[in-house]
C-alpha cells in the first residue's frame, strides 16, 4: 500500500509536491466549500490518476498531516498492492430515504470477503442514525464500518459529495475494502464533561426532543446555560447532549436548532423516547485527551500506512486556536510516519466498541487506520 498527499488551492493550484503514484486506485479529496475552479481540479486529477476513483467531500476544515486548512483541496492518493475496492454512489433526496440508502449500500457492497466500509455522506439531509441502521442490519457484524458526514464550514445548510464528478448536494458514497491483506482499525472518543443529573426522555420524535422528565426540554436547557442561553442556537455547540446506553457507553448529540414556540430542540441524531440523557459542557483539556484516546484505540494496528481523521465541527469551534493540539495528540500516539488526512464534519460514523455495530456520533474525534500486510513505512 502506497500513499501520497498533495494540496490544491484556487489561487495557487497545486503545491510543490510531485505526483508519483500514477497507478493509484483511490483518491480522497477533502475540499472547502468555497474552492473555485473545481472542474480544473477534477480534470487535473483524472489526468494524473487515470485509473483511480476520485471521491470528493466538502468540509468544515481540511486536515493534512498536522495542519488544519480552509478552502483547500487535500488530495490523498492510495495504491493498494493486494486489496480490491468497490464503490457505491447513491443519491438521497429526503431524510426519510436515509435507511433505504443504507440498505442499498450494504446490498451493493456485501460479499464474503468484505473487510470494511468507509462511508462519506452528504451532511444536511441524511439522518445518520437511520443510514447506519440500514447498513448494520444488512452486513455481518465482523465488517468494520466507519466514515463521516460532509461539512459546510459550520453553516449546516448544504454539503457536497461526489465520485468522479464535481461534488454536489444529495450524494452518499461508500467504499468497500476486500480480502485478507487489508488491515483496518478504528477509534472514536469525545472528551466532553457531563453536568447535571441524568434525565429521561419523555417525549421525542426521531431527532426532535420535546420533554425531559415530563418537563419542557428547552426551558430546562436554558436554565442550565444561564446567561449563555441568550446566545442560542450558536452556544448549543458548547453544550451537547449525551445519550447513555444500557451498557454504559455514550453517544454525543449536537443541537442543530431550537423552536421557541414548540419548546423543542432538534439534534444531529435521533433522541429515542425513554433513553437516559445528560447535558455536557466543553473542557479544553478533556477534548484534547479524547483525541489522544481515540488514537490509542487504534493501537491494535501497529504503524498504519494511512489514518483518516474525522472530527466534529463543534470541536473546532470550541477549541479555536488550540484545535491543532488534537491533531498533535493523535500523531504523537500513532506515529509521524503515517500519512494523515481528514476533515471537520457534521457527524462521525464509527463503532462504539471494537467490532460492534457502527453508530452516528457528534462532537467526537473518529479515526480510521489502514495498512496492508507487509507494508513497511519509510
Residues covered by each model-derived region:
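Small-residue-enriched flexible segments
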Residues: 1-48, 52-53, 57-320, 324-335, ...
Amino acid at each position: 500500500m502506497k500513499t501520497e498527499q498533495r494540496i490544491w488551492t484556487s489561487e495557487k493550484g497545486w503545491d510543490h509536491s510531485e505526483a508519483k503514484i500514477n497507478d493509484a486506485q483511490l483518491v480522497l479529496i477533502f475540499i472547502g466549500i468555497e474552492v473555485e475552479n473545481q472542474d480544473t481540479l477534477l480534470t487535473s486529477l483524472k489526468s494524473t490518476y487515470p485509473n483511480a476513483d476520485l471521491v470528493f467531500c466538502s468540509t468544515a476544515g481540511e486536515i493534512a498531516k498536522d495542519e488544519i486548512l480552509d478552502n483547500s483541496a487535500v488530495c490523498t492518493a492510495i495504491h493498494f498492492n493486494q486489496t480490491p475496492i468497490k464503490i457505491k454512489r447513491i443519491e438521497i433526496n429526503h431524510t426519510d430515504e436515509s435507511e433505504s440508502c443504507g440498505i442499498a449500500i450494504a446490498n451493493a457492497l456485501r460479499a464474503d470477503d468484505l473487510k470494511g466500509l468507509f462511508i462519506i455522506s452528504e451532511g444536511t439531509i441524511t439522518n445518520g442514525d437511520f443510514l447506519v441502521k440500514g447498513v448494520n442490519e444488512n452486513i455481518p457484524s465482523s465488517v468494520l464500518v466507519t466514515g463521516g458526514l460532509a461539512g459546510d464550514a459550520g453553516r449546516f445548510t448544504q454539503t457536497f459529495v461526489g465520485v468522479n464528478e464535481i461534488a454536489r448536494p444529495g450524494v452518499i458514497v461508500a467504499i468497500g475494502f476486500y480480502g485478507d491483506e487489508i488491515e483496518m482499525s478504528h477509534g472514536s472518543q469525545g472528551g466532553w464533561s457531563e453536568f447535571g443529573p441524568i434525565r429521561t426522555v419523555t417525549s421525542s420524535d426521531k431527532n426532535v426532543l420535546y420533554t425531559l422528565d415530563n418537563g419542557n426540554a428547552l426551558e430546562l436547557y436554558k436554565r442550565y446555560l444561564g446567561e449563555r442561553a441568550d446566545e442560542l442556537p450558536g452556544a448549543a455547540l458548547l453544550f451537547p447532549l449525551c445519550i447513555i446506553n444500557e451498557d454504559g457507553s455514550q453517544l454525543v448529540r449536537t443541537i442543530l436548532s431550537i423552536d421557541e414556540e414548540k419548546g423543542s430542540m432538534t439534534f444531529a441524531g435521533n433522541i429515542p423516547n425513554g433513553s437516559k440523557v445528560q447535558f455536557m459542557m466543553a473542557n479544553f483539556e478533556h477534548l484534547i485527551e479524547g483525541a489522544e484516546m481515540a488514537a490509542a484505540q487504534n493501537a491494535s494496528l501497529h504503524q498504519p500506512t494511512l489514518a483518516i481523521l474525522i472530527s466534529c465541527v463543534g470541536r473546532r469551534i470550541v477549541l479555536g486556536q488550540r484545535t491543532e493540539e488534537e491533531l498533535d495528540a493523535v500523531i504523537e500516539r500513532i506515529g509521524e510516519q503515517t500519512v494523515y488526512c481528514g476533515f471537520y464534519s457534521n457527524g462521525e460514523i464509527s463503532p462504539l466498541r471494537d467490532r460492534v455495530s457502527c453508530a452516528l456520533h457528534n462532537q467526537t474525534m473518529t479515526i480510521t487506520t489502514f495498512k496492508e500486510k507487509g507494508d513497511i513505512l519509510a
